[in-house]
Amino acid sequence: MSFKFISRLAAIIVCVPLLHACITPVDQEDEVVKVKNSGITLEFDGQLHSRVSATLGNEMKVLGDYQGSEYLVTKSGELIDDFMLLNSTQHQIDSNLGSGMQTTLVGVASNGLQKQLQVQAFPNFPNTLFIRVTYKNTASQSLIISKWVQNAYQLSAAENTQHTDLMTAMTRSEPDFWSYQGASFADRRDWVMPLQPGYEQQNYMGMNATDYGSGTAVADIWRKDIGLAIGHIDLDPKLVSFPVTYPANEHITEKAAYLHVELEKTVKLAPGDELTTLDTFVSVHQKDYYATLKMYRNVMAKKGLVMADVPDSAYEPIWCAWGYERDFSFDEILQTLPKAKELGLEWAVLDDGWQTAEGDWYLDPEKFPNGDADMQAFVEDIKSAGLKAKLWWAPLAVDPGTDMIEQHPEMLLLNKDGSTRDVTWWDSYYLCPADERVRQHSVELVKKMLGEWGYEGLKIDGHHLNGVPPCYNPEHNHATPEASVEALADYWKLIYETAMEINPDAVIEICPCGDSYAFHNLPYMNQTVSSDPLTSWQVRLKGKTLKGLMGESAPYYGDHVELSDNASDFASSFGIGAVLGTKFTMPSDNEAAQQFLLNPEKEVIWKQWFDLYNQKMLPKGTYLGELYDIGFDRPETHVVAKDGSLYFAFYADSYTGSLELRGLTAQQYKVTDYFHGKDLGVVTVTDGKANLTANFNQFLLVELIPLGANGSE
């Protein structure tokens, strides 16, 4: 990391109470201040506006124009974004991110508001800079602040806007940008998308519907040659937003996308008062967003959020009884278990329908007339069939009219007006994860399900589980309403640790049903899932995302294959290293089950995929997410390394042409289409790459085995 000091000083001396010293302001015509890490540079002008540059090869690329990158908005709507640069200092620091350098820049606005900007650079994170801002009101009048904004940057559409000709810009067929945005929405939209002119999305990390919210506090925009990302690194979830926009009204050769982080909260800054923002980052990368998520995961691990250990059973394939839906019978499930075992499945999941209601969690007396004894016997039947038993559960929800509401209304999470908060799917209400009574009630349920009934895993399900709104229940005595928001991850930690105390090999799957996973919850589960994907594309993009956030060998479950394209796209899960699963049914009188019947034709296909899965076990390999760009590279490509081989997965409606094989270290590789059992010959490597001529529809799965100097495996 290096720093370019200012060389010329103006003659006027200005007193800066924030630093308790008198500081000399900088000549506004002087060179900009440059704060660098090895791969990224922030340049600040005399008004403390900034722009980002990247050095990820032999040249520096300026990514956009100067912006008012850190500023305040007053209650009246005034932007305070011009701060005359007064001084800058630099010193070495040591933190949980390692040894690094901190540059402090100080500026003052015309109304007397002072800005102290700290920029930290660590060799451990060479393409990233970390930022914190403190504002101090040194004027004699109070300021009412409604919002702070940070990391407001521009990414130009063209690699060099000054030399982009109009014809090139007009004839470009691919999108200018792709983007990853970590917010959650009720329509369960894609987390990764191309940006079209006119695009805008607020990406609020709170609730974007009554029961959809939270997410991963990162936004990333990339063009074909370079990407730009921002995020916050607080150990608690915060109600910030990450707006991403791509205006439609800019000249075609000056097109640019924008992103920033903001927090809307009214704060009165009396004379002498200070306001400090969150710790945030700005990062640059090549190819897609995977490098950003990997960096973010590593940063948060150094700060204390470490992903859970994973038992081998978390990689085993799954059969789920949800094909029979809520009106299942035990005869239906029990007659299906032998077929599940025959196909190579290792888990059987009892889904929704075993309980009388959400909240009470009493056993349905029609299905369990003998109560706990019947449930224990059912679990033993699953184990006798050679399968492990997992149970569905939707905590933090309580149905109207239940004993819990009648006996414990104080457990409810309440809105500001005192009303209950709806969980729409189950027509229920939110419970508050910060309330100790809710926490202990959940602990007792986990002890019953895993300890008394004998289940070896939990499928914790519901879009309401990803985030919760602020709680205004006076019975809870919260320090702030946001206490519920920040307590959710700790609630999951309690559930996870309780489960591990009972069974250290228990599989804890949390399925937030269409939400973008809240990163702060991830350390407290050991299996994620594509959570009701709308398309096979979502299966793949969610897999790439969660491998980035949890680890290259994290057990990500592709969900029931029946939710994929054509209800049979095993390849989208298999090729990215996802756990396979199904909810097939056997003949019965259950109408809901008819669409999932395992007929003889399907059985052959299901058997082939599960046999191949158990043979290869790709989720235990290493997902190489930085080799290909999920947006710009065509065909879409994913790679898993395992046991010395490389497994490439290509996806397209149809493709004929040459495939570029990246990440190769040997001189030659034997290539096999391992799904169809076809020998595709030998490829020779040049500069870590090789090419393979291919013709396929939907998918192509190939294994590359390195050959020795004599051509042997």
Stretches with model-predicted labels:
Residues 20-21:
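C-terminal motif of bacterial Sec signal peptides marking the signal peptidase cleavage site
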Residues 26-43, 50-246, 674-679:
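Polysaccharide-binding surfaces and accessory modules of carbohydrate-active proteins
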Residues 39, 133, 272, 319, ...:
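Conserved, mostly hydrophobic/aromatic
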Residues 42-46, 273, 277, 492-681, ...:
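Active-site-proximal substrate-binding groove within the catalytic cores of carbohydrate-active enzymes
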Residues 142, 236-301:
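Extended acidic/polar, glycine-enriched regions
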Residues 291-347, 351, 355-356:
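An acidic-aromatic substrate-binding cleft motif
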Residues 328-342, 439-451, 566:
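Short, acidic/polar
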Residues 344-555:
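Aromatic- and carboxylate-enriched substrate-binding clefts and catalytic-loop regions
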